[in-house]
């Protein structure tokens, strides 16, 4: 019995360094490898960029160029045409929920389709009642999305991008007023949640030529997505 006892103790002591170094290796890997998940619509997806990178691909490149001792992997889950209720349905799917639990940073860009589609598919003319009803539903969906994402990983940061006026070179004061209203409401919602940062995108295209920064009436081209990527870099410390 004594021989067996001594043998068991010897095995236990032999395993201690293995367990320690295994734990240390896992901790080191988690500190040097970071995962970023992007959620949203065609803007997150990067529609309109000839390089098919959008602002997410460009941001990943910029972040990894900045960090030499830490690597960032970006996972783009953006779906063209997606509205906030559809995003809610997406993030509760088992495979997506599993991904969310492993993320260190989330980037959410949603709401453009809620605004445009509920106005009839474009922004000309504007329908006040429909837009205000859509905003109410959107904010409810955003609140639930932030709760779900925040619960998936309580240590992760969440970046929420504001909306922009897609007609910066037109006489679009009325559109601008609604975009500002939605953005202000988004900022108020963001403040209710922990580890969530709001990043404005509306100033990016003001005073700039539509044909130089847009692929079509709504989506940026490569230069436009570059502006968004730079904006995030300036407002969030990866």
Which residue stretches match the model-derived regions?
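Histidine-centered active-site loop/cap adjacent to the catalytic His
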Residues: 215-238
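Surface-exposed cleft-lining segments at the edges of enzyme active sites
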Residues: 79-84, 115, 122-138, 170-173
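Substrate-gating cap/lid alpha-helix
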Residues: 166-201
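Structural recognition of the beta-strand scaffold that forms the well-ordered cores
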Residues: 36-38, 73-78, 104-109, 157-162, ...
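Hydrophobic membrane-insertion alpha-helices, especially the h-region
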Residues: 7-20
